[in-house]
Amino acid sequence: MRGKTLLAPSLLSADLMNMQSSILSLEGEHDWLHVDVMDGGFVPNITFGPGFVGALRGAFPDEVLDVHLMIEQPSRMVDAFITAGADYLTVHAEADHHVHRTLSRIRENERKAGVSINPGTSEEIIRPLLPFVDMVLVMSVNPGFGGQTFIGTMMEKVTALARWRAALGLSFLIEIDGGVGRQNAAMAARGGCDVLVMGSAVFGTPDPASTLREIRNIVEEADERA
Ligand code: DX5
Ligand code: ZN
């Protein structure tokens, strides 16, 4: 049986001038904090670095920090994010020539290793890596910005990954990122997503905590039926 669906608000859509109060506005209704790291090369945007992750870790020692690296050659930077205090560290398969080595490095440091694929990348690419990951992040928009529209066909990747996971006896989590919100959370949970990343759908609402409570009810109902 699946575990309960986890909710991971993305700080990309938080109030950058008031990060601490944005996080507190979640009132603990979330499971993880998702941190989008962008380098202006792999994606056409620049966001947070290890210093930000370290500051988060210092201010919120008990939070699960889910760090999504949308950067070229992530192997050069994983040590810095490990030191900063990331719990989950996810690298893009498209950005690294030696993803297995990078994933191993993350795990050697007792952090959870994730691999991600863009909408245009087949899940077949990461099939050989599945025994070496704690999470697969399926991008359901082209990474770079919040507030984009969910690409529904990406759920086919989730189905394939869940099937392979069962066949191989593995236990990695499947995370979906981009365009997720109240309108499709039940479908995503029922379709096999274990972690829902949500930026604008949470921080773009007047009361993020009550939005999360609503989405929690929606996914719990879906979990019961799954
Ligand atoms: C997109 C990022 C996402 C983003 C999602 O490149 O990886 O995590 O914050 O934002 P929404 O939920 O608004 O699509
Ligand atoms: Zn992300």
Pin down the residues of each PLM region.
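N-terminal amphipathic alpha-helix/helix-capping segment at the start of soluble metabolic enzymes
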Residues: 1-13, 20-21, 223-226
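Conserved anion-binding
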Residues: 3, 15-18, 76-80, 86-173
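Hydrophobic faces of well-ordered beta-strands that scaffold small-molecule active sites
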Residues: 5-10, 33-35, 56, 65-69, ...
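Catalytic cores of alpha/beta
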Residues: 21-26, 75-83, 121-133, 178-196
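Glycine-rich, proline-tolerant flexible connector loops at the mouths of alpha/beta enzymes
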Residues: 34-50, 141-149, 206
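A short alpha/beta connector and helix-capping loop motif
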Residues: 43-74, 185-202
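Short helix-capping segments at alpha-helix termini
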Residues: 59-63, 108-110, 165-171, 220-226
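C-terminal helical cap(s) of enzyme catalytic domains, especially alpha/beta-barrels
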Residues: 106, 189, 204-226
